[in-house]
Amino acid sequence: MGTLLALVVGAVLVSSAWGGCVEVDSETEAVYGMTFKILCISCKRRSETTAETFTEWTFRQKGTEEFVKILRYENEVLQLEEDERFEGRVVWNGSRGTKDLQDLSIFITNVTYNHSGDYECHVYRLLFFDNYEHNTSVVKKIHLEVVDKANRDMASIVSEIMMYVLIVVLTIWLVAEMVYCYKKIAAATEAAAQENASEYLAITSESKENCTGVQVAE
């Protein structure tokens, strides 16, 4: 168990040390009437390089063929296109307070079936080097399905089972440690009591012998 604890602590320390940008895929199933976050994370290859980034999101509704632009985010300004499907529903949830955007995620509030389809997060980044500038572009694609009720995926079920198993194992280990410590303390206490009793008997016996010797001398 000590080894397991050391591994957990080590993992936490390593993750804290890295502490950089990590690209994570977006969830792809939204529940009707709920708020849904569409992830778009695009990390720089070299964190020390200065950069400026902006994004444009496009959408192709399920059953249609063309992508249409729904928003642009640049210089901390969100520009929404006139589209009744997204009017009053899109909220910026990406990087703030910087022109070097790496998290370009958005929220869609009060999701409807009209939001089912394909999303594209276009990332345009300008990198500044000592003697030149370099433009890069990346497209993150997300397919979204809107459902009536959330369906738990296998990964979340397995994670929950593993969590409960770990709790049970830790509880059993803790109880075993407590029982072991209790028995050890009880044994030590009993040994100390026996030692004290032996010393008391020895002192009593010696006192009697001394008293007998005094009476004989008289």
Curated annotation (Swiss-Prot):
Matching Pfam families: V-set
Glycosylated position list: N93, N110, N114, N135
Extracellular side: 19-157
Gene Ontology terms: cellular component: intercalated disc; node of Ranvier; perikaryon; plasma membrane; sodium channel complex; T-tubule; voltage-gated sodium channel complex
Keyword Signal appears in the UniProt entry: yes
Topology in membrane: Single-pass type I membrane protein
Keywords: Cell membrane, Cell projection, Disulfide bond, Glycoprotein, Immunoglobulin domain, Ion transport, Membrane, Signal, Sodium, Sodium transport, Transmembrane, Transmembrane helix, Transport
Ranges of residues in domain Ig-like C2-type: 22-150
Compartment list: Cell membrane; Perikaryon; Cell projection; Cell projection, Axon
Leader sequence segment: 1-18
Membrane topology (Cytoplasmic): 180-218
Organ and tissue specificity: Detected in brain (at protein level). Expressed in brain, heart, skeletal muscle and spinal cord.
InterPro entries, per database record: Ig-like_dom_sf, Ig-like_fold, Ig_V-set, Na_channel_b1/b3
Bilayer-crossing regions: 158-179
A biological-process GO annotation: regulation of sodium ion transport
Cysteine pairings via disulfide bonds: C21-C43, C40-C121
Domain of life: Eukaryota
Gene Ontology molecular function, alphabetical: sodium channel inhibitor activity; sodium channel regulator activity; transmembrane transporter binding
Subunit annotation: A voltage-gated sodium (Nav) channel consists of an ion-conducting pore-forming alpha subunit functional on its own that is regulated by one or more beta subunits. Interacts with SCN1A; regulatory subunit of SCN1A/Nav1.1. Interacts with SCN3A; regulatory subunit of SCN3A/Nav1.3. Interacts with SCN4A; regulatory subunit of SCN4A/Nav1.4. Interacts with SCN5A; regulatory subunit of SCN5A/Nav1.5. Interacts with SCN8A; regulatory subunit of SCN8A/Nav1.6. Interacts with SCN9A; regulatory subunit of SCN9A/Nav1.7. Interacts with SCN10A; regulatory subunit of SCN10A/Nav1.8. Interacts with NFASC.
Function: Regulatory subunit of multiple voltage-gated sodium (Nav) channels directly mediating the depolarization of excitable membranes. Navs, also called VGSCs (voltage-gated sodium channels) or VDSCs (voltage-dependent sodium channels), operate by switching between closed and open conformations depending on the voltage difference across the membrane. In the open conformation they allow Na(+) ions to selectively pass through the pore, along their electrochemical gradient.
Record family assignment: Belongs to the sodium channel auxiliary subunit SCN1B (TC 8.A.17) family.
Protein name per the record: Sodium channel regulatory subunit beta-1
